[in-house]
Amino acid sequence: MPLGLLWLGLALLGALHAQAQDSTSDLIPAPPLSKVPLQQNFQDNQFQGKWYVVGLAGNAILREDKDPQKMYATIYELKEDKSYNVTSVLFREKAQKCDYWIRTFVPGSQPGEFTLGNIKSYPGLTSYLVRVVSTNYNQHAMVFFKKVSQNREYFKITLYGRTKELTSELKENFIRFSKSLGLPENHIVFPVPIDQCIDG
């Protein structure tokens, strides 16, 4: 199964950029979890709803100036068992259609941490961790993702916004945090805001 399909919303279009690289190239190592903060007193009911992906950074994400990544949205829907139904909606420009990636995030060992539900249904995927780094719930959030696929470790940080634009201060903070985890500038992108598919 192609890497792009395995990402299933972790990197979405960013994964396609990664496929263009030499598949034998070395990935930037994932940081120890001790370097990744966890939002204190995480409020799962306040976190749910639609988030726009304002920033993306990761060891399989590369900035493409000629074909910049388009913004997509992710909707978190809290279920009675405290897991989330998570739907990412993106616009496929060539096909001129909306794509939907649906998965379940199951509560992990502490509030604000999650694993992927039904992980065995994703071939080659052996672990998947989601950690909410910080959020104020009504404006912005930073979320860390780490997975092991085909025995390779991938990680990503997403900057979410309740709106398509965030302050330069929040973006700078996102860049600083991404760099603190070992990612250089060309592995940090700010998707271009669009209207197709992600509004409504």
Stretches found by the model and what they are:
Residues 1-200:
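A beta-rich soluble binding module of mature secreted/lumenal proteins
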